[in-house]
Amino acid sequence: MTSRLQVIQGDITQLSVDAIVNAANASLMGGGGVDGAIHRAAGPALLDACKLIRQQQGECQTGHAVITPAGKLSAKAVIHTVGPVWRGGEYQEAELLEAAYRNCLLLAEANHFRSIAFPAISTGVYGYPRAQAAEVAVRTVSDFITRYALPEQVYFVCYDEETARLYARLLTQQGDDPA
């Protein structure tokens, strides 16, 4: 039986999955890093959907998640979450990052999505140390999938080889085959 958790090194915008997670900022208006890449690849329909969410409920708070159509992406939907800015680890960053992953998974489960792809949330300009963020991600997702049937497949999509090796090592340590 193949693992429900897999590591992929590459471009998250190119994946054909039910949901791609966007490491968004609170405004949901696009930005740098993976957020900008997803907005560019999805086209203007994604920005329009994000504007509508902002009009209806305001900014997306740290640790929360919202869902939009995927625009021109191959995915069915984009789940936007706001991870914490790293401030040394003493401002509930781990709890907020855990909430971001969990809330994305809850949206995926509620929408009956079979597959979801996560970037390394908060590890870019938000400065969360990659190793610590990966531990939170793997622990949170592993815990979730032991209790829920969906999503059936979770991908950790890493932009660079070093981060991909880090996630693969963590999955191997817990007994999952990351390939």
Swiss-Prot record:
It catalyses: 3''-O-acetyl-ADP-D-ribose + H2O = ADP-D-ribose + acetate + H(+); 2''-O-acetyl-ADP-D-ribose + H2O = ADP-D-ribose + acetate + H(+). The gene is ymdB. The keyword Hydrolase applies. SUPFAM superfamilies: Macro domain-like. Substrate binds at D11, I12, N25, G33, V34, D35, S122, T123, G124, V125, Y126. This is O-acetyl-ADP-ribose deacetylase. GO terms for biological process: purine nucleoside metabolic process. It comes from Salmonella agona (strain SL483). It holds the Pfam family Macro.
